Design a protein with these regions (language model features):
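Conserved short hydrophobic interaction patches
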Residues: 46, 114, 118-125, 244, ...
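C-terminal structured interaction module
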Residues: 216-264
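Hydrophobic alpha-helical segments and helix pairs
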Residues: 84-126
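Short, highly charged C-terminal tails/helix-capping segments
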Residues: 62-65, 134-141, 255-264
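N-terminal low-complexity, intrinsically disordered segments
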Residues: 1-93, 227, 233, 262-264
């Protein structure tokens, strides 16, 4: 089962590792060339820390199919980073997108509230024509140790849509060197989801940081709405994607896992 109509539930032991919202728009060159001082002032109370980096842009290839195709290097893209005082929230602004991310997701309502003000300020100051892509990504990482489920097979915690090979009782779980599932699913006329699911290791970032040896289950759901979304409908588009994400998440897990995550 890929989708479930199980009621939306808030879990005390929620597995969300990172949540990212990104809205792409037709390029606004001013963002790349002029410091976003007015935008910073509008959001500075919530995102007081600022940094800027130059991201390498992919090269452009011209003359494909001809006798002498050329690879043209593109100028770097300025990525403006605004970070909350507690370092829990990060806002990125480039000439092509605005994005909000957090490693401490507590629920959709708070996430939407954190996005409201910067998104409204961005629309007011930069007046994008529309949003070409509205994206919402949930990277969920399930730890059996954290949930008190050590020794419980993944096949008992996740539905066969994501664990079909591991449902074979004759083959021990540790025999699978790779058992990942990658799907692209159409959700409705304008929405789709790219899903990666399966056991894996989560690498900790930073120099000399000790790595966690526990094998975890990763459920990475990257949902998007394409087509030209009017700015006034961006919030509604995100609500639609969130609704789809709930059905996908609940469709991936079993009642055994729901119990361990401790529904409120």
């Amino acid at each position: 089962m890929l989708f479930s109509d199980h009621p939306r539930t808030h879990y005390r032991n929620a597995p969300a590792h990172e949540v990212i919202c990104q809205l792409r728009f037709p390029s606004i060159l001013t963002i790349n060339n002029v410091e976003p001082a007015d935008f910073q002032e509008a959001i500075r109370a919530e995102f007081p820390q600022y940094a800027r980096r130059q991201d390498a842009a992919p090269p452009r290839i011209t003359g494909l199919g001809g006798p002498a195709p050329k690879v043209e290097q593109q100028p770097p893209v300025t990525n403006h980073n605004f970070v909350s005082e507690d370092n829990q929230w990060k806002l990125n602004l480039t000439k092509d997108f605005i994005a909000l991310s957090t490693l401490h997701y507590s629920g959709w309502e708070e996430f939407a509230r954190q996005l409201d003000k910067p998104l409204a300020a961005f629309i007011r100051l930069y007046k994008p024509a529309y949003f070409q892509r509205v994206g919402l990504r949930y990277v969920n990482v399930f730890s059996r140790a954290r949930l008190g489920l050590e020794g419980t097979p993944w096949a008992e915690l996740f539905t066969p849509a994501y664990t079909a090979p591991m449902q074979d009782a004759e083959l021990p779980e540790d025999r699978f060197l790779n058992c990942a599932c990658d799907l692209t699913v159409k959700l409705d006329s304008s929405c789709q989801a790219k899903i990666h699911a399966g056991p894996g290791m989560v690498k900790r970032r930073g120099p000399n940081v000790p790595q966690d040896p526990e094998v975890k289950f990763i459920l990475d759901m990257d949902l998007s709405m394409t087509g030209n979304t009017p700015c006034t409908l961006a919030a509604g588009a995100l609500e639609t994607l969130h609704g789809h994400s709930t059905r996908l998440f609940e469709g991936a897990i079993t009642d055994r896992l729901r119990d361990a995550m401790d529904a409120e």
